[in-house]
Amino acid sequence: PASSILHALAHDLPRCGGMVHQAEDEIAAVGAMLGAYFGGTPSFTVTSGPGFSLKQEFLGYAQMAELPGVVVDVQRAGPSTGMPTKTEQSDLEIAVHGRHGQNAAIVLSVANVSDCFYAPHVARYLAETLRTPITILSDFHVANSFGVVNEMRSCQLDDVADIATDVLERFDLQPLAVAPLIHPNQAAPGHSPDMRRITGLNTDSEGSISYRAETAQQAHATRVAKLDAVRDALAVPTIHGDTAAGVLLCGWGSSRGALYEAVDELAAAGVRIAGMHFHTVFPLPQALTSVLHGYDQVFTVEQAYGDARHPGPFAALLRQETACDVRTLVGQATGRPLTPGTIVDAVKEGAHG
């Protein structure tokens, strides 16, 4: 389903002075994207299914070498070839923790057509500020959707620091306060007569290869600090529905429409319930833990498998990050988009269960 992005950009990007490169395979594509960024050209690559798995080694390399980059993964039903023309939200775990070693990634998601326009700008801002690859999770449902939208804000930037605050706020973000780097003493290539060293080996602040224990520990601490910089800039997503309800339904990505409509339908029927939708799915806001612990029950609605014994990927992530007893209310892995009726029925069944 990532082909829809390729088709659109092949038509439109050359008009804006850009170019589209269709590489021979997924590994070459992500390598070309990182090489372009190293040369000073903002770039991104798109993929789906097993192609996202093939990109993981280069994404780990980019984290170690502090190369910016943006990857859009249009999720489909899996694993393996699975159902290429069906939708799912089952790549969350690989997006966050898919590379070997200890290096969680920053992950954004899109809920609708408008988000697809703005998400790459936010991802570019994060990637260039923190010098790290950013993943945007879409899915087949969004990638093949059409919608009438308001006029888009132009986000052509010479300097990502000039990104509009309201664009960041779509993803619950404020401008980053700090930009921790492993190699603060290295110049960008082409901007200095100094040598710019780049490697996947562990290095010190000058870019020199180092096997020293304290250097390795500091590099890990800096990578974690990049996550914390995003975490500290994140606001808890706005509550939709009854702010005094004891039950909270959480979703992310393309589940927003069905989630909000279900909450509204339940409220009209006298059910006190609230909804929360996440655009930034990792890291999560610092204040989220206390918010979730303020509810009697917290559930997720996901287009990924989950049941009473096996929490869905997003429920598992919320548990891991907040130590809150989050359970999966709807864990739908049918290949079909979530509907409000599915969520409403699950809430009613739970109330009588």
Where do the PLM segments sit?
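Flexible loop/turn segments at secondary-structure boundaries
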Residues: P1-I5, A28-V30, F52-K55, A77-T81, ...
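Thiamine diphosphate
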Residues: P1-A105, S109-V110, G341-G353
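Flexible, low-complexity linker and terminal segments
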Residues: R124-G353
